[in-house]
Amino acid sequence: MKNKEKDMKWTTLDSEYLFRRPWLTARKDRVRLPNGHVIEEYYVLEYPDWINVIAITPDDKFVFVRQYRYALGKTVNEIVAGVCEEGEDPLETAKRELMEETGYGGGEWTKTATLSPNASAMSNLTHCYIARGVELTGGRSLDEGEDLEVC
C-alpha cells in the first residue's frame, strides 16, 4: 500500500510574507501539486493554536461568556476560547482561559478533538475540551481588550 500522505503532499516553490502581526500572519505561496499543476498564488493565514472549552457545572449548567464581537457586528454567547501561548500545553491553556474568563476551575477534563478551523487556508489547530463539574473558584482576570459577561 502506498503512503497516501506522501503522494498527496504539495511542494512549496516560493513563499512571501504579506504581513506579520501578533495574532495574524498572511503568506502568499507558489505551490506545485503532485500532478504537476502549479498554483501561482495560494494564500495561507498563520495563527497560533486555539482552545475551546465546553464547561459544565456539577448541577449540569453550561458556562458561557457573552461579549461583543466586532467582526460579527453583534453581541454573542460563546463557549470559552483562547490562544495557546508559545510552548504552552493546550490543556493548560484551556484551564487558564476558563479561569481568566469565567472564574470557574477544577472539574474533570476530557480532550474531545483536535480540529483545523479552516484547513484550506489556516495553519493552526483548535484543541477542544469538555470540563465537567467545574465550580466558581476564583476571580476573573480579563485581558485589556476583553469585556465579557459570564452566563
Residue ranges and their predicted role:
Residues S15-L18, A113-N118:
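Short, solvent-exposed loop/turn elements at beta->coil junctions and helix N-caps
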Residues D14-N52, P58:
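Acidic, metal-coordinating catalytic segment for phosphate/diphosphate chemistry
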Residues R27-N35, N118-G138, C151:
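Active-site-adjacent beta-strand/loop module that shapes the phosphate/pyrophosphate-binding cleft
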Residues K2, D7-K9, Y42-Y47, N52-R96, ...:
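Conserved Nudix-box catalytic region and its N-terminal flanking loop in Nudix hydrolases
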Residues T11, G105-T112:
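A short coil-to-beta-strand element that immediately follows conserved catalytic motifs
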